[in-house]
């Protein structure tokens, strides 16, 4: 059993790995646009993840959980898979119009969509502090993208921003459906079922034959996209073992900053100049990014505090009964 210091260091390590790999992912996805369409690449990522995770779950002997699922559980599982397919595919598509850092920052509206989903479907409450953070995310987005307002004629960027919102909304619906399945399946089995479902459903719409003509560099990029899916989610799951959910969520909110830094490093070293370019963000845009990240972190902190208060209020009632 690790002590408190080891627990903190393990949590920090796995959270950092998660942020690093999620920060690198949009760069790799943008590079993949030169040799693969978003649907085919997403199909490949799901297929590789399904094989790796399937072998892992089979070795652990936990596949028997699926035998206990009812019809409505399977329907929820397939619906969650459909939303995750939309999430993966649309985010990859958005990178045809946005820089990696901008796409990751735009995705920070996901907590708002998740909260609204909880409000409408799970009857959860959003307090005024959370609403204030959501307003902060919106204001930060406007400040970050302020050069676009000044330039005008940047319709493709707004189109990309809209695609990211679709991706974030789809991810939020996936997260809500996944939450409803936690009592029936382990999170790893939920992901496995979704990966296999996506592998089958997306095959008619993808062109795997196009992957056979990839160059050596293209193969490395595609392989990284696939392995990234496994490593990032694996590190995220491990981080959740050692840190509280709010700590992990707050650290993951730094992903846009990581994506921005990595993009600028690629530009500084002259890597992939045909695909990766600098955002040329000014001080005001960087301030907008800071507002978005700070607001996203505060949403997690406030939500955790609300949950703790609710648990403390419920405890005396339970003891009284």
Give the positions of each predicted feature.
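Transmembrane alpha-helices of multi-pass small-molecule transport proteins
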Residues: 35-86, 113, 169-177, 191-210, ...
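C-terminal-most transmembrane helix of multi-pass membrane proteins
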Residues: 46, 146-147, 218-220, 252-321
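Transmembrane alpha-helical segments that form core, pore/gating elements
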Residues: 27-30, 53, 114-116, 120, ...
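Helix-helix packing/entry segments at the starts of transmembrane helices
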Residues: 19-20, 44, 103-109, 178-199, ...
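Juxtamembrane helix-entry segments on the extracytoplasmic side of multipass membrane proteins
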Residues: 7-11, 35-43, 68-73, 146-168, ...
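C-terminal transmembrane-helix exit sites in multi-pass transporters
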Residues: 52, 57, 110-132, 257-284
């Amino acid at each position: 059993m690790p002590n408190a210091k080891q627990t903190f260091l393990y949590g920090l390590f796995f959270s950092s790995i998660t942020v690093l790999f999620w920060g690198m992912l949009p760069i790799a996805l943008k590079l993949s646009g030169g040799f693969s369409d978003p649907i085919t690449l997403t199909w490949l990522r799901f297929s590789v993840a399904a094989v790796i995770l399937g072998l892992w779950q089979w070795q652990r002997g936990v596949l028997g959980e699926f035998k206990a699922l009812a019809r409505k559980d399977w329907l929820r599982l397939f619906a969650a898979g459909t939303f995750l397919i939309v999430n993966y595919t649309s985010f990859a598509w958005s990178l045809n119009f946005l820089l990696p850092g901008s796409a990751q920052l735009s995705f920070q509206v996901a907590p708002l969509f998740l909260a609204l989903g909880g409000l409408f479907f799970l009857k959860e409450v959003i307090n005024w502090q959370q609403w204030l953070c959501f307003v902060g995310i919106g204001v930060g987005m406007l400040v970050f993208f302020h050069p676009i307002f000044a330039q005008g004629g940047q319709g493709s960027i707004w189109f990309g921003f809209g695609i990211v919102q679709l991706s974030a909304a789809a991810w939020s619906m996936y997260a809500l459906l996944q939450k409803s399945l936690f009592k029936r399946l382990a999170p790893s089995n939920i992901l496995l079922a979704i990966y296999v479902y996506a592998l089958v459903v997306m095959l008619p719409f993808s062109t795997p034959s196009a992957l056979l003509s990839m160059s050596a560099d293209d193969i490395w990029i595609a392989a990284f996209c696939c392995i990234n899916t496994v490593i990032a989610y694996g590190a995220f799951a491990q981080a959740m073992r050692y840190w509280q959910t709010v700590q992990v969520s707050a650290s993951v909110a730094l992903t846009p900053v990581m994506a921005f830094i990595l993009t600028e490093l690629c530009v500084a070293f002259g890597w992939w100049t045909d695909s990766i370019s600098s955002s040329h963000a000014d001080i005001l845009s960087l301030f907008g990014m800071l507002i978005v990240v700070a607001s996203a972190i505060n949403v997690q902190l406030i939500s955790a505090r609300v949950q703790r208060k609710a648990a403390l209020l419920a405890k005396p009632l339970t003891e009284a009964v």
